[in-house]
Amino acid sequence: MKRVDYSREAFECPEYDTFESPLLKSQPLVSIIIPTLNRYDYLADVLRDLERQDYKNFEVLVVDQTDPFQESFYQEWSLDLRYWYQEEKALWKARNEAIQAARSEWVLLYDDDSRIDSNWISEHLKTIDFFQADISSGVSLSVVGAEIPKHYSYFRWSDQLDTGNVLFKKSIFDDIGYFDLQFEKQRMGDGEFGMRAYLNGYKNISNPKAKRIHLKVSQGGLRQMGSWDGWRPKKLFGPRPVPSVLYFSRKYFGRRLSIFFLLHSIIPSILPYKYKGNRILTVLVFLTFPLFFPFIVFQVFYSWYLSTAKLKNQHN
């Protein structure tokens, strides 16, 4: 049996490179939405990259949650720029309100700690047009100059939705609702919306042409609000996993599969994230798990209790 490297042979799309996109030629307005929190230095690089885009018909909406808010930062940019201060530190609220305020049918979500090439907007629009898709999910890299991972190196139906690099039709939100605010300050809000879009028949294409460098800086953003890893609580007596993880799982996959999900993931989660993949420490965690068992059980039941409250309060 011959082994085939599907990522390099089976899914080539040479006609994309020569495709003359009618959508791109029509130059529709694109609304780029950026929530920000305590990252003016990085946001400046973001706006400079947008100034250098080869596609020019776009507006930028910045929802600033920084303390102290510096209105002077927004002067002198060569952009169609709108901004406002949001007192509450809330990512999904910021995105929902900015989407509602957007003037365009095309909404492009972006992060405040990322870098992009000059053809970023163009490639998103071209992909939407070429595949007659509803969503273009760009690729995110963590290192400047890094090679795109094989499973993201070709066009395909996307199995993720990254709200730091994705283009939507605004009408999708009118149809299936906005981001679920019960994920605020927690995890998987973008994944839940992606699942909702998929179940409602929207075509989401993984787009290797629209890549970004996600710097994942330590200051500001969601990490400042106390959430980074869905399985490793920040506080000793915090729920494990983050309640929104179980909320998502129970909402879409039910109680039984969520229990299997816990059994599969809970022991590896004891190992700190920076040591993830260390085989020796992983074995040590498995050997010492009985010592942690009562404490872990408390964390899991606490998370389950909180996710139950979320299920009772869900609006979608």
Model-identified regions with their sequence ranges:
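Conserved nucleotide-sugar donor-binding
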Residues: 103-104, 162-177
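Short aromatic/hydrophobic "clamp" motif used to bind/position activated sugar donors
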Residues: 107
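Acidic donor-binding loop at a coil-to-helix junction in glycosyltransferase catalytic cores
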Residues: 185-195
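Non-catalytic, C-terminal membrane-associated alpha-helical segments of glycosyltransferases
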Residues: 2-21, 35-37, 253-316
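Short, acidic, metal-binding catalytic loop of nucleotide-sugar glycosyltransferases
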Residues: 48-57
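Conserved donor NDP-sugar-binding/catalytic core segment of glycosyltransferases
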Residues: 115-152
